[in-house]
């Protein structure tokens, strides 16, 4: 019964899809380094300046100071300050020394910076939800296939070495010829139709991801230019005047002779806002050329990452470059960004350095001495250690011993029953 249960467990375990113990590629970067830098600066700087503006407001306690008559109590002076601060956005209640100016921009300056920060975060947010999942799945497939290509090359190199060793050991010509032909077929089968190469070539005719990428970069550039225009206009506005005249004669105070017709008011935070606008403007002006550079990054047509794989026979025909803007140019950039996750690249980079040193060493000969990259985790199977194999062997031996003991006891029981029957008949 125990043997049948163990056999059933082994049979059904082959049909079950086991979950991988840990992900093969952890921490894939789905955003280019230059794009992430632009996002952090463009979004983080306004938020930092907003925090400074609100800290200044908390420390000072008021954003406006109106010069009330000495006969006014502190409550009446506070009412004048509150009334004129609330009337900043009303053009008919305010009159500046330089004419009618939109002084409400001073009041809403921190909130406009917050608006630009939100707008600049929208393109990365769109990229994260619209394009990043597709790129993540494709990158995992491509990097996994690159490791498999490396493993196939090692198998082929070792099979060729075994062929040479058997040629020296075998003296029968017919057997040697048949063996060499079979090994050559196995080696050649490793190099037929590399799927990763064919898959990358299909991306030359695809423009879906590159359109999303260029759209996000263009939208970021437009928002930064609009922010620069606003900050420049605000700086020129704040440099004209931060003082204005306010009238509170309305309602029941219209005919009150004790209330002055006009009050001279001054916006206290304009100087701080002017400094913050200059800082933000300078940073955005310096950031705009970087955003323009990101538009032309996919046009570089770099395939340096895959060039190291040309050492392998599988990649002898991998001599293609992206022409213009297409998804292939974008995948090359993201492969370069995540190349540290590809183990086969590190091994082949060592072989390339040895080959370029001019020592005359055949890279294919070195492949026979390299270890294969474990792909069991990707397939959902964990490699069985020696201790687990020994434990399973012990369990099998115990089950066999239990089976033998049960058969021995059954035979002894039958013999005892026969003996009792013979004794009773006598």
UniProtKB/Swiss-Prot annotation:
Sites bearing S-nitrosocysteine, chain numbering: 40, 347
InterPro entries: Innexin, Pannexin
Self-association and partners: Homoheptameric.
PTM annotation: S-nitrosylation inhibits channel currents and ATP release. N-glycosylation plays a role in cell surface targeting. Glycosylation at its extracellular surface makes unlikely that two oligomers could dock to form an intercellular channel such as in gap junctions. Exists in three glycosylation states: non-glycosylated (GLY0), high-mannose glycosylated (GLY1), and fully mature glycosylated (GLY2).
Transmembrane segments: 41-61, 107-127, 218-238, 267-287
Effect of residue 255 to Q: Impaired glycosylation. Loss of GLY1 and GLY2 forms. No effect on oocyte survival. Located in the cytoplasm. Decreased levels of pro-IL1B upon LPS priming and ATP stimulation. Attenuated pyroptotic cell death induced by LPS and ATP
Organism: Homo sapiens
Principal location: membrane
Highest taxon, organism lineage: Eukaryota
Stretches the record annotates as Disordered: 405-426
The protein's name in its UniProt record: Pannexin-1
Phosphotyrosine, modified sites: 199
Catalytic activity: chloride(in) = chloride(out); iodide(out) = iodide(in); ATP(in) = ATP(out); K(+)(in) = K(+)(out)
GO cellular component: bleb; endoplasmic reticulum; endoplasmic reticulum membrane; gap junction; membrane; plasma membrane; protein-containing complex
